[in-house]
Design a protein with these regions (language model features):
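Extreme N-terminal tail/first-helix region
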Residues: 1-38
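Short, structured beta-strand-loop surface elements
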Residues: 4-8, 77-132, 138-142, 150-152
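Short coil/turn segments at secondary-structure boundaries
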Residues: 33-36, 136-140
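Extracellular/periplasmic catalytic domains that process cell-envelope and extracellular macromolecules
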Residues: 39, 66-67, 138-139
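Short beta-strand segments
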Residues: 42-79
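Short beta-strand micro-motifs in enzyme catalytic cores
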Residues: 46, 144-146
């Protein structure tokens, strides 16, 4: 499974968020001020570690999440850009991921929700972070909703 690390290729505010999350072992960084991205307050975030599809290196990104039936749900919005985020491309190539939610760390298998499940999860996630709706309006691609199914021993 991929390991967590501070990303080098992302903006400084994301690097700082991940560094705080990791250095505090999840005691800080879990709640994030979403106003920087158009939100209206603090939102819970997780860290997702994927394996780079070309490099094979671990890649870590913080993401807003929701919980449904013991699984975690994230949105591959990339702010509504025309391309999917790299982390999503990575997990479609290798769905085995590592997840940190506050102080809880676990392995999971990522899958893209489809059909009715996607619609229900999209509604839940856009209720948590309403800017997702604006992101969807500004792109021609359907923004993926990803379910992180924890691996049980």
């Amino acid at each position: 499974m991929p390991e967590f690390s501070v990303p080098t290729q992302l903006p400084d505010w994301i690097k700082d968020h991940v560094a705080l999350y990791l250095e505090s072992e999840g005691k800080e960084g879990h709640m994030w001020d979403s106003s920087i991205a158009g939100g209206s307050g603090s939102l819970a975030t997780l860290l997702l570690a994927t394996t780079g599809r070309r490099s094979g290196d671990s890649r870590t990104v913080p993401l807003i999440y929701g919980e449904v039936d013991g699984n975690y749900v994230v949105v591959a919005s990339r702010g509504g850009s025309k391309d999917h985020p790299d982390w999503y491309k990575n997990l479609t190539a290798n769905p085995d991921v590592s997840v940190r939610v506050a102080t809880n760390v676990f392995d999971a298998v990522a899958r893209t929700a489809e059909g009715d499940e996607r619609e229900a999860l999209w509604q839940k996630m856009s209720d948590i972070f309403p800017p997702y709706n604006a992101y969807q309006e500004r792109t021609d691609r359907q923004i993926p909703v990803v379910v992180l199914d924890p691996v049980t021993a």
